[in-house]
């Protein structure tokens, strides 16, 4: 960012639409929704394109997503007449040639770094703010997520407009508007990622089943490394560039 701007301090009482509007107004052309094609993104896509039909959306393609996820991807692009910015990891053939079979089992941290974290870093490269579907009730690691704050891990702003929404809030919004959503949700998948690391389950218990992992690499890096130092905008917080510091802890 080259121009200074000042953010309001009362975002906790703001609606999801108001948070999105603030992001669009504050970071024109340099804010994007990170889309993983789950129910939260079904809600946010509808809200975002209602506010700005030219809004930016990006997705990480690990080449291991479910067929249903890829079909929803195409449906979203048709519905909103948009092209989702794609950031991909190595193809399965490239992974095997370089690291052998089933890297996600033999070296899961390396797989996440290659397939998710590296593409995410590229996606965030020209952004000043990114938007996610993180909700506080999804996992203990997300319980204190701010609606907007400074993401120290990536050195940009991060917005979680649905932070205070529940599962039922999301489904009510989807039903009332007849929005497309990932049909895997109807088959018991609350959280959806790669085919090899996702099983049916409530909350995030179906992700990385059989391990003690609750977050994929890109979320964990942001939530643990970044959001522990995230700040909510203070009354005199003026941002001017990516090195901006904020004054008061976002969890207070």
Predicted regions and their residues:
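Nucleotide-activated chemistry modules centered on ATP-dependent adenylation/adenylyltransferase
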Residues: 1-252
């Amino acid at each position: 960012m080259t121009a200074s701007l000042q953010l309001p301090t009362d975002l906790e009482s703001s609606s999801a639409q108001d948070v999105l509007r603030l992001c669009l107004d504050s970071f024109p052309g340099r804010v994007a929704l990170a889309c993983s094609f789950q129910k939260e993104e079904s809600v946010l896509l509808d809200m975002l394109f209602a506010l700005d039909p030219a809004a930016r959306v990006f997705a990480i393609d690990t080449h291991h997503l479910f067929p249903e996820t890829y079909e929803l991807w195409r449906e979203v692009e048709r519905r909103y007449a948009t092209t989702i910015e794609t950031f991909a990891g190595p193809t399965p053939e490239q992974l095997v040639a370089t690291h052998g079979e089933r890297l996600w089992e033999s070296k899961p941290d390396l797989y996440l770094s290659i397939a998710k974290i590296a593409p995410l870093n590229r996606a965030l490269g020209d952004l000043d703010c990114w938007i996610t579907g993180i909700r506080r009730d999804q996992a203990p690691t997300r319980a204190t997520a701010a609606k907007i704050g400074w993401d120290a891990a990536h050195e940009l702003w991060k917005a979680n407009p649905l932070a205070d929404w529940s599962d039922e809030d999301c489904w009510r919004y989807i039903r009332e508007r007849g929005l497309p959503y990932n049909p895997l949700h109807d088959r018991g998948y609350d959280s959806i990622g790669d085919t090899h690391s996702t099983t049916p389950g409530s909350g995030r218990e179906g992700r990385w089943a059989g391990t003690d992992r609750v977050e994929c690499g890109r979320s964990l890096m942001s939530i643990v490394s970044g959001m522990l130092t995230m700040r909510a905008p203070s009354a005199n917080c003026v941002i001017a560039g990516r090195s901006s510091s904020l004054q008061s802890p976002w969890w207070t």
